[in-house]
Regions:
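Membrane interface segments of multi-pass transport proteins and intramembrane proteases
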Residues: 30-37, 68-84, 163-173, 192-202, ...
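Extended, hydrophilic extramembrane loops/domains of integral membrane proteins
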Residues: 1-17
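Juxtamembrane "helix exit" motif at the C-terminal ends of alpha-helical transmembrane segments
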Residues: 11, 52-77, 152-174, 180-183, ...
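Alpha-helical transmembrane segments of polytopic integral membrane proteins
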Residues: 8, 60-64, 68, 93-103, ...
């Protein structure tokens, strides 16, 4: 994901001063400059990824754990504390999404997110991929990453209920070790939700679809056109519709 963002950012034109500097360089100097920029880009990418992981773990796993621990003095049940931890985690997650959605740039990203969902829903419902059909399609989708993250939060409550050790350090270590397992179970649920369309699956998918009302916004026609171009660059949707008989 970071590599794709960096690649996208590379298409922004340099300012006039930068252009003049590069034009004045010899071929060897230009090559050395490009190598330097690549190294800086890799370092920036590594630092960003590392910070993102630490930030996410701190905000969504460690902070709820320590906040729920405050109630140990008044609540003796480990089960209730674990449930409280899960509720705090959900509240932080929803609050975080609500907060970042107030910024203009993120709101615009969410509009593109909505355009992406609309394009996929348009194809999966057997319609021609054009602006008019995409516009009237739903901006919510069962296989969305937002649904995945919410399911991770919910399933983690169940898994963490079974951590019954006294050491707080060991409790944190076990939580970290369970993250890949929780992510795997959540991924399989998302796949199941995308494959089947029955009442039980639809009910279980509702929380994720509700969250998508926050992480997707109605796109304008230009954004829809970008979404269509992106889909067509990735796969042959007409061939897919024929193969799937949709």
């Amino acid at each position: 994901g970071m590599q794709t963002l960096m690649y996208s950012a590379s298409f922004f034109e340099d300012d006039e001063d930068e252009k003049k500097k590069k034009e004045a360089m010899t071929q060897e100097e230009r090559k050395a400059q490009e190598e330097k920029e690549k190294k800086q880009e890799k370092a920036m990418m590594g630092g960003t990824v590392a910070f993102s992981i630490v930030f996410a773990l701190g905000l969504f796993f460690f902070l709820p754990y320590f906040l729920s621990g405050i109630f140990h003095k008044v609540i003796s049940s480990d089960t209730v504390i674990a449930l409280l931890e899960g509720l705090i985690r959900l509240a932080i997650f929803i609050g975080y999404i609500a907060l970042i959605s107030l910024t203009p740039d993120i709101k615009r990203v969410f509009m593109y997110h909505g355009a992406e969902h609309k394009c996929i829903n348009c194809i999966e419902h057997g319609m021609e991929l054009n602006v008019e059909n995409v516009r009237k399609s739903s901006r919510q989708h069962k296989r969305c990453g937002t649904s995945f993250l919410l399911i991770v939060m919910l399933i983690s409550i169940v898994f963490f209920l079974f951590i019954r050790v006294d050491s707080r350090i060991l409790q944190l270590v076990l939580r970290l070790l369970l993250i890949p397992v929780i992510a795997g179970v959540s991924y399989e649920f998302i796949r199941l939700a995308g494959r089947y369309d029955n009442r039980l699956v639809n009910i279980l998918s509702k929380p994720g679809l509700w969250m998508q009302k926050m992480t997707t916004k109605e796109p304008d026609d230009e954004m829809i056109e970008v979404g269509i171009a992106s889909v067509e660059a990735v796969f042959d949707w007409r061939k897919w519709q024929k193969e799937e008989n949709v």
